[in-house]
UniProtKB/Swiss-Prot annotation:
Homomultimer. Interacts with envelope E protein in the budding compartment of the host cell, which is located between endoplasmic reticulum and the Golgi complex. Forms a complex with HE and S proteins. Interacts with nucleocapsid N protein. This interaction probably participates in RNA packaging into the virus. It is a multi-pass membrane protein. It comes from the Viruses. It comes from Human coronavirus HKU1 (isolate N1). Belongs to the betacoronaviruses M protein family. GO terms for cellular component: host cell Golgi membrane; membrane; viral envelope; virion membrane. Isolate N1 belongs to genotype A. This is Membrane protein. Component of the viral envelope that plays a central role in virus morphogenesis and assembly via its interactions with other viral proteins. The lineage of its organism: Viruses, Riboviria, Orthornavirae, Pisuviricota, Pisoniviricetes. Residues 1-20, 73-80 are virion surface. The chain crosses the membrane at residues 21-41, 52-72, 81-101. One of its GO terms (molecular function) is structural constituent of virion.
Length: 223
């Protein structure tokens, strides 16, 4: 490959570049760090969505850089490593889409393409299905109602609900299985507040039950 087409930088030019762009790079890295550190669904859904976009862009950016390194490798050793890294990045990116599509088939929610987790908590509240990502594989889930505001695992889902509106079952959908949680405890603190604890009771390869009466017969279809 003709090296004359490649830009050549001296150490002085590199230092000058860092001096000119140091502030901008620092601000960008600080912004990304804050988003990644504090982007949780229990804090701010808007910040969490920005975090998901940043994480989602990481893989295509990585693939682009590894392909670039293949074309402009310094020597054969760097070329070999670049090819391996490119293959690994593309394979992982494809697996991400395969798993996300499988989870989307199971839940029908766009949260299935969340790059952070493959666990989606699903709860049917008065005929409305709420789907939210959860990071860990919990053995118990806690639903809290505070003056009509509904929270599941600290994530606010909506308002205008009471403890009597809580379902008997809550599910967590994964790529391979659907975990069912059964309500095991309910405590009413006052008229509009209380909490319930759901315990994992069953795991199977099912689709998410439909919230529509006409779709209840498809609740146990294989995904």
């Amino acid at each position: 490959m003709n090296k004359s087409f490649l830009p050549q930088f001296t150490s002085d030019q590199a230092v000058t570049f860092l001096k000119e762009w140091n502030f901008s790079l620092g601000v960008i890295l600080l912004f990304i760090t804050i988003i990644l550190q504090f982007g949780y669904t229990s804090r701010s859904m808007f910040v969490y969505l920005i975090k998901m976009i940043i994480l989602w862009l990481m893989w295509p950016l990585t693939i682009t850089l590894t392909i670039f390194n293949c074309f402009y490798a310094l020597n054969n050793a760097f070329l070999a490593f670049s090819i391996v890294f490119t293959i690994i990045s593309i394979v992982i990116w494809i697996l991400y889409f395969v798993n996300s599509i499988r989870l989307f088939i199971r839940t029908g929610s766009w949260w299935s393409f969340n790059p952070e987790t493959n666990n989606l908590m699903c709860i049917d509240m008065k005929g409305k299905m709420f789907v939210r990502p959860v990071i860990e594989d919990y053995h118990t889930l806690t639903a809290t109602v505070i003056r009509g505001h509904l929270y599941i695992q600290g994530v606010k889902l909506g308002t205008g609900y009471t403890l009597s509106d809580l379902p008997v079952y809550v599910t967590v959908a994964k790529v391979q299985v659907l975990c069912t949680y059964k309500r095991a405890f309910l405590d009413k603190l006052d008229v509009n507040s209380g909490f319930a604890v759901f315990v994992k009771s069953k795991v199977g390869n099912y689709r998410l039950p439909s919230s529509k009466p006409s779709g209840m017969d498809t609740a146990l279809l294989r995904a």
